[in-house]
Amino acid sequence: MAVIYYDKDCDLSLIEKKLIGIVGYGAQGHAHAQNLRDSGLKVIVACVEGGRGWKKATADGFEVMCVAEMAKKADIIMMLAPDTSQAKIYKDSVEQGLKPGKMLMFAHGFNIHYGQIVPPSFVDVTMIAPKCPGYMLRQVFTEGAGAPSLIAVEQDASGKAKELALAYAKGIGSNRAGILETTFAEETETDLFGEQAVLCGGTTSLVKAGFETLVEAGYQPEVAYFECLHELKLIVDLMYQGGIAYMRDSISDTAKYGDFTRGPRVINEDTYETMGEILGEIQDGSFAKEWILENQAGRPVYNSLRRMESEHLIEEVGAELRSMMSWLKKKK
């Protein structure tokens, strides 16, 4: 049974006198920093000097400095730079600022779990991972609600790492929605699997396969786009709101019967076997090794695949159709 913490389990006073340093002011960084500040906590931000994050954090009223300076000053250091940058940032600028009594925090376990960052034994190492994008973490906080988070403790040098992490979670508003206890290993492996097999890799491959099947059978690409991509949001929103059963109760009986009888033919035993292989590559570290080496080599495979995918017909058709949808506003 999952252990979930709520407001009664979180004591904000534990970190009220501590200085919190946020590394990065991007998608998650801005939300963490602003929520913590609005909770009455002391926050400083570390970014690349003169960069977009530096300018934005300064405009938002934060004291901004280089990472090395922040690491010396802060009692709690939350690593919110991109995963692929964190190991270098840590080695170059954070490690030398760590002292007994400090806590190093993460919002994703990749670098700790796969040994890219190895903190000294005298610091607490914890994770608070909000289960939503940064803009939503900020939005629900300003509305008086909160987003759920995962909590994990990798090192408890102080003897109160969990309590301190729970206080941080309250600072960003997760006490209002629930803070589920996990481990760095479980968070990392399930997060990667979800991205690869379902949320990103699985979904985009399914959408493209459906689109290509219809187009190759002679149907208009525009109609195929609507049926296989555009309407996906309607179904996902229903599942998000009330689960799979709620979604099925909200669609026609014809759609439901097709779901029950044809869905398992698309996602079949072969798919389960492949999913197991993908999970195995995550668990044994082979995916992490592949991705780390890809970055070290300058991302040749990544860049080639990204370019190829951007040229898919579904992108051309989608751009044309979306340009006529006045309610869609492209984010700047």
Swiss-Prot record:
Residues 1-182 form the KARI N-terminal Rossmann domain. Mg(2+) 2 binds at D191, E227, E231. Keywords: Amino-acid biosynthesis, Branched-chain amino acid biosynthesis, Magnesium, Metal-binding, NADP, Oxidoreductase. One of its GO terms (cellular component) is cytosol. InterPro entries: 6-PGluconate_DH-like_C_sf, KARI, KARI_C, KARI_N, KARI_prok, NAD(P)-bd_dom_sf. Pathway: Amino-acid biosynthesis; L-isoleucine biosynthesis; L-isoleucine from 2-oxobutanoate: step 2/4; Amino-acid biosynthesis; L-valine biosynthesis; L-valine from pyruvate: step 2/4. It catalyses: (2R)-2,3-dihydroxy-3-methylbutanoate + NADP(+) = (2S)-2-acetolactate + NADPH + H(+); (2R,3R)-2,3-dihydroxy-3-methylpentanoate + NADP(+) = (S)-2-ethyl-2-hydroxy-3-oxobutanoate + NADPH + H(+). The keyword Metal-binding applies. Its EC number is 1.1.1.86. Its cofactor is Mg(2+). It is an enzyme of class 1 (oxidoreductase). Disulfide bonds: none annotated. Substrate binds at S252. The keyword Metal-binding applies. Residues 183-328 form the KARI C-terminal knotted domain. Binds 2 magnesium ions per subunit. Mg(2+) 1 binds at D191, E195. GO terms for molecular function: ketol-acid reductoisomerase activity; magnesium ion binding; NADP binding. The active site is at H108. Involved in the biosynthesis of branched-chain amino acids (BCAA). Catalyzes an alkyl-migration followed by a ketol-acid reduction of (S)-2-acetolactate (S2AL) to yield (R)-2,3-dihydroxy-isovalerate. In the isomerase reaction, S2AL is rearranged via a Mg-dependent methyl migration to produce 3-hydroxy-3-methyl-2-ketobutyrate (HMKB). In the reductase reaction, this 2-ketoacid undergoes a metal-dependent reduction by NADPH to yield (R)-2,3-dihydroxy-isovalerate. NCBIfam families: ilvC (TIGR00465), PRK05479.1 (NF004017), PRK13403.1 (NF009940). Belongs to the ketol-acid reductoisomerase family. This is Ketol-acid reductoisomerase (NADP(+)).
